[in-house]
Structures are given as C-alpha cells and as structure tokens.
C-alpha cells in the first residue's frame, strides 16, 4: 500500500517510529540510550511535543506523541536524531547515515491512542527480551508502573486522567489482538489515520484529501499536494 505524504495533526496523538540505518544497533548500550533520552527531553520540551509514551530498542525507537504546534513533531525528531547521529558517528569513528530515511507516523483517535501506547510498551515483551513491560528500563512503562522517574520529558497528565498503575497493568496483561498489531503497523507505514470512519472523515474534510484506503479502481487523486498537511484541533 502506498505511503501518503505525512499528515501532522495538532493536538491529536500520533504513533511514530524510526529505525537505524540498515537496522544497525544504534542504541546498543545504556550510555547511548542515556545520551539519546537527554536529547529527546531537550527537544520535545523546546518544540512543545507532548511525549505520552516511548520505547527504545537497540535498532529502532517508538513514540506516542501529541504535537502542540504545527512543526513540533518534525523539529523535535530532526534535532534529536541529527544531534544523536553526530554523537554516534563520533563515538564509533564512523560517518554517513545513522537513521534510515524519514520517520513513519500516523494520527490516532482516542481509542487507538491507548492501543498504540500498549503496543509501544509491549515491544520488548513481543521481542522476548523481558517477561513484563515494566522490566524494560528504557520505555515509559517503568514510569507508568512507578518503577522509574518520568525524566525524559514524559507527559503523564493524560495517562493519569485515564489510568492507574493497576488498570494499566491489567490492560497490558490482556494482550494484543493480531488485528490490532497489524493495523498499527500498516497505518504507521502508510501514514493513514488509525481510527473510526468518523475520525478519518473528519481529517479528510479538514485536509481535503482522501485518507481512507480506496476499494479498487483507479486511485483517487489527493486534493492537497503539499508534502505535509498540518491541522489544528482543540485540546
């Protein structure tokens, strides 16, 4: 399925991911991850990108974020990943690309916000690295379960309004449907919004673009050909 030009929706959650170039281990040690998290904290706060959740793996990263300004997502990742690439190349006496292309992202409705956050925090569990999400120290799960400090610029307000440690533990323990995992991956890869038909229709009306997958025939022409569509919704 073709990848859409990126859609950034102010005050709407997004799932975001990016891999290391050639899937190389760019976050292999605790020292590298600490450098990365310090940069991430700096730039999400500077550019007003609310960080609701994250997970750092050895060769890729996942986030659930809410941009509070039109360029918050692009600038935060551009500067975090640019500065980290300079650090990593210097530390490894290397040169060239550290990150694989541009990041992937998709807007989320209110239900899929939590589905995506669960998906992000269960990443190390699916990979067989830990038995429970909170055992992985380099994700937001540690803060959500009270075993780590939200020192990465993590925005806990929305999570606290909806969850407690006990209810979040139950939600993660309930597991993920394969259909949910597939939907998150597909929408993130293509850039299509993940949500109800009503949610997607709202975004289509605002962007003047066809965002729902077409059912065969000739593909519809986008009505807005900008590289990135920026919307603003009320908080």
Residue ranges of model-derived segments:
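Glycine/serine-rich anion-binding loops at beta->alpha junctions
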Residues: 60
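Short Pro-Cys-Gly-centered "Cys-loop" motif that presents a nucleophilic cysteine in a tight turn
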Residues: 1-57, 66-235
